[in-house]
């Protein structure tokens, strides 16, 4: 799959519909957008730079390294290109997925060393991104800061030396979808798909 070639079998389309809750018409729209944006460099699929350009409007408060890490998480076959299924799945996780799925991905994104725990520097990065995104969305700075600190506080960690594990992070942040919205993982408005 890739630029100009997002033809999926009926079974693959049905699988995407079931997995993502997108309709057939939405899958068709995503296919058109994928073909348009992924063909800029004449390579097959979404490259890292095309991914960053495409998602910059949503993640303008994220630094480039974090966007590269996000790309790598979605590039499940590790070939440096997002094929159409990976692209649709990435949009689903960022917009329509249940809060727990979004939080699981966010944990993996910020657990840069893949230790299974968010250490101090990783938590600081998470807090910085959440505060920047939240305030750019019009949320009160002190309210955003206090909320994020309450999620990442030592009270929510069973092993304060190692840091917060994935289960603890999800439990602390999943009381509502507020944290996901703050970090720009929110369902799009109206008819927009991303």
UniProtKB/Swiss-Prot annotation:
Ca(2+) 2 binds at residues 111, 113, 115, 117, 122. GO terms for molecular function: calcium ion binding; kinase binding. Keywords: Calcium, Metal-binding, Repeat. One of its GO terms (biological process) is calcium-mediated signaling. Ca(2+) 1 binds at residues 75, 77, 79, 86. Residues 62-97, 98-133 form the EF-hand domain. PANTHER family: CALCINEURIN B (PTHR23056), CALMODULIN (PTHR23056:SF110). Belongs to the recoverin family. This is Calcium-binding protein J. It comes from Dictyostelium discoideum. The gene is cbpJ.
């Amino acid at each position: 799959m890739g630029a100009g070639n997002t033809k999926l079998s009926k079974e693959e389309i049905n699988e995407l519909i079931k997995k993502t809750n997108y309709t057939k018409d939405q899958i068709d729209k995503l296919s058109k957008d994928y073909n348009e944006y992924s063909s800029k460099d004449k390579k097959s699929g979404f490259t890292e730079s095309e991914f960053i350009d495409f998602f910059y409007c949503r993640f303008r408060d994220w630094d480039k390294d974090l966007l590269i890490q996000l790309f790598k998480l979605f590039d499940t076959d590790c070939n440096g290109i997002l094929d159409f299924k990976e692209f649709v799945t990435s949009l689903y996780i960022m917009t329509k997925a249940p809060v727990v799925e979004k939080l699981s991905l966010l944990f993996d994104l910020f657990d840069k060393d893949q230790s299974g725990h968010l250490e101090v520097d990783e938590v600081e990065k998470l807090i910085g991104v959440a505060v920047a995104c939240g305030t750019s969305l019009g949320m009160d700075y002190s309210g955003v800061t206090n909320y994020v600190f309450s999620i990442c506080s030592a009270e929510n960690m069973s092993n304060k030396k190692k840091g917060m594990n994935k289960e603890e992070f999800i439990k602390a942040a999943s009381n509502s979808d507020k944290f996901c919205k703050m970090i720009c993982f929110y369902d799009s408005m109206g008819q927009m798909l991303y």
